[in-house]
């Protein structure tokens, strides 16, 4: 079974990845204006996120505008929104569950097997949360690539990957790896290791009585 150090490492990785997912969901830099071809814009930079689009001037001032209509958004953007929100909610739930089952905490009672199962459940929830975020970021990234190579879209309104999508990929990987380490807390190994089959020794010949 995984020791408390391995559990703590997995929880720390998953927590760090979840914080990254929160950051990438909130910031608007999922797409950034492309400078490919003749599209050379030095006066301003345009960004698009899950909730708003922003324009940054050369002076450093940024102005953002929230999306007015949900129905006017693309299906990929709406799906990415939903998956990221689900990922964050599952990650928060996984943190609570994993904390109850970790060896270094007093929550969840003193039953080691029960705590190991709780920690393993938290790790599985972390993995599901990371996969949801990974699918969301990959789907959104695929849409960016598709639009970039679409000849019907003018060059001056094409976008490239923004920093947020890379943060999302990195955060997803950390959450999945951290959840995998927590899932190594399999209670079966410990229960088998804690029980030893008693050995039977043959009786010594000296104990026999001779007439």
Swiss-Prot record:
Induction: By androgens. Signal peptide: none annotated. It is a multi-pass membrane protein. Phosphorylated. It is found in: Cell membrane; Basolateral cell membrane; Cell junction, Tight junction. PROSITE patterns: CLAUDIN (PS01346). Residues 210-211 are annotated as: Interactions with TJP1, TJP2 and TJP3. Residues 29-81, 139-160 are extracellular. The chain crosses the membrane at residues 8-28, 82-102, 118-138, 161-181. The keyword Transferase does not apply. Residues 1-7, 103-117, 182-211 are cytoplasmic. Its main location: membrane. InterPro entries: Claudin (IPR006187), Claudin7 (IPR003552), Claudin_CS (IPR017974), PMP22/EMP/MP20/Claudin (IPR004031). Directly interacts with TJP1/ZO-1, TJP2/ZO-2 and TJP3/ZO-3. The phosphorylated form interacts with EPCAM. Does not interact with CD81. Plays a major role in tight junction-specific obliteration of the intercellular space. This is Claudin-7. The gene is CLDN7.
